[in-house]
Amino acid sequence: MAERGELDLTGAKQNTGVWLVKVPKYLSQQWAKASGRGEVGKLRIAKTQGRTEVSFTLNEDLANIHDIGGKPASVSAPREHPFVLQSVGGQTLTVFTESSSDKLSLEGIVVQRAECRPAASENYMRLKRLQIEESSKPVRLSQQLDKVVTTNYKPVANHQYNIEYERKKKEDGKRARADKQHVLDMLFSAFEKHQYYNLKDLVDITKQPVVYLKEILKEIGVQNVKGIHKNTWELKPEYRHYQGEEKSD
């Protein structure tokens, strides 16, 4: 790109500072739906006891999500998004824009990094559940055939599927793996009642093999390795809908 066009360094001369902010995918998708150069939300920066607090509020007219993964849906996106501020870490990061005539312009130098996270709410929990359900759906779909299948299959003493199923039951201590979405629903339901669980209790609740259950837990939860809740599991911050309590070190 630089070989074909000119490079405008006005931003460097003006020493323009910019923020590099990571936002959730659904938020960027909602911004893209805004008409023209309309307002997408409000950014608030406040000082509390010498500490900078930043948050973004999405406009109400952009909060409605009508599709998830290309499938029709009806859910409201979280509107409140507090920022988690991060240092640049000694790096020199810059932001460029490119015009239709291949002209590059330096817009500014990154002076602050941040992550825009949704506040814990029922809307966010419902959105995450729909996203998990959509991602868990099988890619392969059944198809109706136009012609009658004439291939003859000979009867067998036992089908391969049943053999594999019985083998897995023995290997997993007679616990057969349930559908992933069903296990997720059981886990979310359990964590709505209590914030912390040890693995043994979750195995008793879900009736799932330990290895399989831990694979799913690692997607939505974290294991505490210290403090008064050592060796227990709790939901990751993005899946919680309760106020986090203080942890002991």
Curated annotation (Swiss-Prot):
Keywords: Acetylation, DNA-binding, Nucleus, Phosphoprotein, Transcription, Transcription regulation
Database matches in InterPro entries: TFIIF_beta (IPR003196), TFIIF_beta_HTH (IPR040450), TFIIF_beta_N (IPR040504), TFIIF_interaction (IPR011039), WH-like_DNA-bd_sf (IPR036388), WH_DNA-bd_sf (IPR036390)
Binding site for DNA: 227, 229
Pfam families membership: TFIIF_beta, TFIIF_beta_N
Record function comment: TFIIF is a general transcription initiation factor that binds to RNA polymerase II and helps to recruit it to the initiation complex in collaboration with TFIIB.
The protein's assembly and partners: Heterodimer of an alpha and a beta subunit. Interacts with HTATSF1 and GPBP1. Interacts with URI1. Interacts with GTF2B (via N-terminus); this interaction is inhibited in presence of GTF2F1.
Family to which the UniProt record says this protein belongs: Belongs to the TFIIF beta subunit family.
Name of this protein: General transcription factor IIF subunit 2
Organism of provenance: Homo sapiens
Native organism taxonomy: Eukaryota, Metazoa, Chordata, Craniata, Vertebrata
